[in-house]
Amino acid sequence: MADPSFDIVSKVDTQEIDNAVNQTAKEIKTRFDFRDTGASAALSGESILLQANSEDRVKAVLDVLQEKFVKRGISLKSLEHGEPRQSGKEYKLTVTVQQGIADEKAKAIAKKIRADGPKGVQAQIQGDQLRVTGKKRDDLQRVIQLLKAEDFDVPLQFVNYR
């Protein structure tokens, strides 16, 4: 029988992202403080474009978007954005949704597992995810607890536990 293993991934459900953006756009249309500000939120691929006619209104739209993400159970760690930039009379802010674990984060997670994890547990980087194998299921449970206690600035999910 093969050794027990599980995968560490960082994925966000695209349907939930779409729902959160649609709820944000709907709330912007109905809220009085956004009236006549040209505020909008639109999803295009893996990024969300927020627009309004002032910098503080764009930041307010971002707050509404973050509130909707939290309500839909999406971690805010998966969002990456800069400062609003002016484009003509409008301010725009591009919010990128991170999918997968970046190489440097994957190396940091693997290093943490080797340093502080139980003996005999191995972590292999496979593209944008990690595969963790060990001799005992209890060791894998300890690795999961270790990683949940640590903050790697990416939302981690543990899947394919065998």
UniProtKB/Swiss-Prot annotation:
Disulfide bonds: none annotated. It comes from the Bacteria. Gene3D superfamilies: 3.30.70.860, YajQ-like, domain 2 (3.30.70.990). The keyword Membrane does not apply. GO terms for molecular function: nucleotide binding. Transmembrane segments: none annotated. InterPro entries: DUF520, UPF0234-like_C, UPF0234_N, YajQ-like_sf. GO terms for cellular component: cytosol. Keywords: Nucleotide-binding. Belongs to the YajQ family. Nucleotide-binding protein. This is Nucleotide-binding protein Franean1_6074. It comes from Parafrankia sp. (strain EAN1pec). The lineage of its organism: Bacteria, Bacillati, Actinomycetota, Actinomycetes, Frankiales.
